[in-house]
From Swiss-Prot:
An MF annotation (GO) of this entry: structural constituent of ribosome
Protein's name according to its UniProt entry: Small ribosomal subunit protein uS19
One GO cellular component, as annotated: cytoplasm
Recorded superkingdom: Bacteria
Protein function: Protein S19 forms a complex with S13 that binds strongly to the 16S ribosomal RNA.
Keyword line: Ribonucleoprotein, Ribosomal protein, RNA-binding, rRNA-binding
Family: Belongs to the universal ribosomal protein uS19 family.
One BP term from GO: translation
InterPro entries reported in the protein's UniProt record: Ribosomal_uS19 (IPR002222), Ribosomal_uS19_bac-type (IPR005732), Ribosomal_uS19_CS (IPR020934), Ribosomal_uS19_SF (IPR023575)
A Pfam family annotated for this UniProt entry: Ribosomal_S19
Biological source species: Bordetella parapertussis (strain 12822 / ATCC BAA-587 / NCTC 13253)
Length: 91
């Protein structure tokens, strides 16, 4: 179920402050955040945001296709190495 239109998108206040400062200062450094729940807004386009995945900060370059999605969607938390091979079938 999606969020109500009348409420608007959710973005953490500290992230908005950092984005505004980066846009005003033309800063190209990645913005480090732990807020995976924040929605990508059109003001974020062209910025690199380092989203925490539980272990490290994954740099995510924001483009226009990402607007409306959550930041956590672009920083995967689980790594799949593949299932163990069956040793009997290899013979």
């Amino acid at each position: 179920m999606s969020r109500s239109i009348k409420k608007g998108p959710f973005v953490d206040a500290h992230l908005i402050k950092k984005v505004d400062a980066a846009v005003a200062g033309k800063d190209k450094k990645p913005i480090k955040t732990w807020s995976r729940r924040s929605t990508v807004l059109p003001e974020f386009i062209g910025l690199t945001i380092a989203v925490h995945n539980g272990r490290q900060h994954v740099p995510v370059y924001i483009n226009e296709n990402m607007v409306g999605h959550k930041l956590g969607e672009f920083a995967l938390t689980r790594t799949f190495k593949g299932h163990a091979a069956d040793k009997k079938s290899k013979r």
